[in-house]
């Protein structure tokens, strides 16, 4: 399972370890409540928008929600191969596996309708996986390489670098380390500045991206609702 450009790609591998043919029923349940971040953290809302009826096709379900701001938000699920049956809250597979046979099921969870493709999920999974790996290699290739005679230390460094780049988002101004996943997956000013300072030796491009992005988001006028004033960042 991995995320790329607003889409969650998932592969389920089913394997029959028996010497006989086996038939199984697999139900995949799903739902979307479109709760905002504060609701998820336990803060109740006085009013909510309206969830629409699921739009169900042979291999696709669209779940949508009309917010109080008048915007419609949607989550789309695509399945490959086509399920035996499908409804607005689950997909059902009736699968027969021969002795030692393995079979893969592919699921796409699309959070931005503009990211939806017409290619079968099996093909999009592997092409997206290659793109994700290339993007990660490009980003981490900027980092300085640290190798010592202590393999435990080396692994700690590799893990730390991998975790750092998991938080990295490419903005128009350059790479920017978001504050945390999942609660704070957005731009924080001081957190990013501290990270940029401490990683100058590792990857100077992070500091460049942080400074340029913060400079691009300086207020130019007074706006009490946004707590903005000239020169203030974010």
Where are the regions that the model predicts?
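Conserved hydrophobic/aromatic pocket- or pore-lining residues that grip, position, or stack substrates
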Residues: 160, 195, 214
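Acidic/polar, glycine-enriched structural segments that form the non-catalytic walls/loops
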Residues: 7-9, 16-187, 208, 220
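Short, charged/polar micro-motifs that form catalytic or ligand-binding hotspots
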Residues: 2, 90, 182-186, 196-204
């Amino acid at each position: 399972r991995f995320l790329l450009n607003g889409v969650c790609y998932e592969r389920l591998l089913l394997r029959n370890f028996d010497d006989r043919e086996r038939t199984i029923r697999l139900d995949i349940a799903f739902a979307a409540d479109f709760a905002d971040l504060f609701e998820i953290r336990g803060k109740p809302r006085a009013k909510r928008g309206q969830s629409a009826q699921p739009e169900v096709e042979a291999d696709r379900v669209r779940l949508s929600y009309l917010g109080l701001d008048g915007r419609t938000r949607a989550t789309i699920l695509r399945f490959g191969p086509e399920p035996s049956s499908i409804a607005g809250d689950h997909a059902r597979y009736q699968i027969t596996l021969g002795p030692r046979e393995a079979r893969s099921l592919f699921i796409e969870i699309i959070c931005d309708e503009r990211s939806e493709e017409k290619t079968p999920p099996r093909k999009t999974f592997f092409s997206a996986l290659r793109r994700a790996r290339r993007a990660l290699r490009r980003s981490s290739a900027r980092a300085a390489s640290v190798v010592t005679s202590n393999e435990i230390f080396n692994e700690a460094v590799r893990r730390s670098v991998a975790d750092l780049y998991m938080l990295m988002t490419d903005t128009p101004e350059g790479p920017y380390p978001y504050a945390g996943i999942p609660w704070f997956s957005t731009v924080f000013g001081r957190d990013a500045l501290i990270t940029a300072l401490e990683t100058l030796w590792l990857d100077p491009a992070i500091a460049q991206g942080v400074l340029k992005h913060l400079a691009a988001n300086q207020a130019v006028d007074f706006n009490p609702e946004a707590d903005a004033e000239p020169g203030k960042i974010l």
